[in-house]
Amino acid sequence: FKDRKPEIPSAFHVQCDSFMFHKERMCRVLETKVPSKYKKLLFIDGDVIFSNDSWYSDISKLLDSHDVVQPFETCEWLDLTYTNVTLTRKSVLFMKESIWNYNYHPGFGWAFRREWYNKVGFFDWAISGSGDTLSSASWLKKSFPKIFKSLPTSLKPAYSEFAAKPVPRITYYEKSKIQHLYHGSKTNRQYVERHKIIDNELDIRKLITINKDGMYEWINKDKWNPLFLEYFQSRADDDLSDLPYRGPTS
């Protein structure tokens, strides 16, 4: 960001001067840097631990016959001592309802056949977060309840186009568990409230441009950067409080 020096000098770097959720767009940019000989991709959060040491090869085998794999069956959130489980949820693939149900988890990581990722992949416009929710709901052809705040109005035109794309052959990594390492209260992340920032009648695609590194930038930084900076500062990701939480997790 701006003139800040990278924390990992040997990593691949991009520059951006806009505050927003960049994950899905960064995945697109990163894919272009992966040598073409690799036909499978895995995007995984850096704060999770697998229970099975063979996860890498097992997920690779699943991608021989599937386009998309969620790399776990069960996920657990650990408390700040890393010893107690505060929340447990199943993979979103266990959702039987046709209407989206927050009691299953859509995040932490997704593996893809590279060909399918390039055809469809993630929903790239979730710049207020919930990209995993919106992406997996489309892949699984789930509809949303009448009161659903994770799809702000400005995203709806782009999401309608995304939802019309091909459905993947999708599965989960059976009998595998991952644990999420604690880093601040989930309550502070405002999984619902954050979407109000862009809940307006403007098409998100008309508010954003792509910079020289392939990253999204606000066209009007003076308007949108202060709003998103205030949100990110309020998250307190390193906070040591551990408040009970049972709401959305992505």
Label the model's feature ranges.
Residues F1-Y38:
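Active-site-proximal specificity loops/subdomain of glycosyltransferases
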Residues D3-I8, W55-Y56, L80-V85, G184-K186, ...:
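Short aromatic-enriched loop/helix-cap "lid" or pocket-rim segments at secondary-structure transitions
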Residues Q15-S18, S54, F72-E73, K175, ...:
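Residues at the C-termini of beta-strands that transition into short coil/loop
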Residues K37-S51, V69:
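Short beta-strand-to-loop acidic/aromatic patch adjacent to the donor-nucleotide binding site
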Residues I44, P106-F108, K175:
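Residues that flank catalytic or metal-binding motifs in active/ligand-binding sites
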Residues D47-I49, T74-W77, Y117, I178-Q179, ...:
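Short, solvent-exposed loop/turn segments at secondary-structure junctions
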Residues S51-K141:
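Conserved catalytic core of nucleotide-sugar-dependent glycosyltransferases
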Residues A126-S250:
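C-terminal catalytic/acceptor-binding lobe
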